[in-house]
């Protein structure tokens, strides 16, 4: 039944609007859970990744919230963190599991050498936390940011040509622990430069329905496509 409804919505051009409406209400509910368990989730993920020798830092919307709002962005429905690593490891998986974080999704790019894992999603007490892997490119690091398919629903996209994605570039720098809602979490010492790279120079001004295409950032479209595997 679901697939039939999706096909009808796609055919009449209402699929994206329907998804946006459904996601809006889902995100409101998820934002409440983030406010309740978000800090605890960050603390456990940080402890797990510290045990594996990684500095887990805030990134994307969670970093923006820390810098601009000194907390979670209103209606932020998940957490974004990163590590500089070539991908996941069994050691990371074991540590995250030991701290109560369940692996629920893997995002990857198909290459001639196999799957290039770019991101993993974990859940802790209902809070989703996206772990982005950052790769080196000259004096920069970059992570991949998957976007919605141009016109297909996610199941069809995942089974065919995947999702468009961007490389989000930030300047390499050191990290230092800073207070975030009572917990000491790594943030880039060049947080301002990172936010400008990710959200443009006017990032301190909240923008409703922010669109990457209308802002000058360091996101680069490369033609690469992402796929996801849910658990």
What are the language-model segments listed below?
Residues 46-79, 86:
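Active-site nucleotide-donor binding segment shared across nucleotidyl transfer reactions
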Residues 76-83, 209-210, 227:
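Short, structured secondary-structure boundary patches
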Residues 2-59:
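Helical scaffold of the NTase/Pol beta-like nucleotidyltransferase catalytic core
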Residues 85-101:
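Amphipathic alpha-helical segments
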Residues 57-62, 72-76, 173, 180, ...:
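Tryptophan-centric aromatic hotspots in well-structured domains and transmembrane helices
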Residues 26-46, 50, 97-188, 193-197, ...:
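Conserved catalytic core of two-metal-ion nucleotidyltransferases
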Residues 2, 89, 188-192:
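Alpha-helix initiation and N-capping motif
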């Amino acid at each position: 039944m679901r697939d039939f409804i999706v096909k009808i919505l796609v055919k009449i051009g209402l699929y994206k609007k329907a998804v946006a409406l459904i996601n809006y209400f889902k995100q409101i509910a998820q934002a409440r859970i983030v406010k309740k368990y978000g800090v605890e989730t960050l603390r456990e993920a940080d402890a797990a990744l510290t045990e594996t020798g990684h500095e887990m830092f805030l990134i994307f919307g969670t970093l923006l919230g820390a810098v601009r709002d000194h907390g979670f962005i209103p209606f932020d429905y998940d957490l974004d963190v990163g590590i500089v690593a070539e991908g996941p490891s069994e050691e990371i998986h074991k540590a995250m599991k030991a701290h109560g974080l369940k692996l629920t999704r893997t995002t990857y790019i198909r290459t001639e050498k196999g799957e290039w894992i770019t991101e993993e999603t974990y859940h802790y007490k209902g809070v989703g936390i996206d772990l982005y892997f950052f790769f080196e490119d000259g004096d920069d690091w970059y992570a991949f940011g998957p976007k919605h398919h141009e016109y297909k629903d996610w199941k069809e996209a995942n089974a065919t040509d995947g999702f468009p994605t961007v490389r989000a570039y930030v300047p390499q720098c050191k990290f230092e622990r800073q207070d975030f809602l009572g917990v000491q979490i790594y943030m880039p010492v060049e947080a301002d430069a990172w936010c400008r790279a990710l959200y443009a120079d006017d990032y301190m001004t909240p923008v409703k329905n922010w669109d990457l295409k209308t802002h000058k950032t360091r996101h680069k479209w490369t033609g690469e496509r992402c796929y996801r595997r849910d658990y």
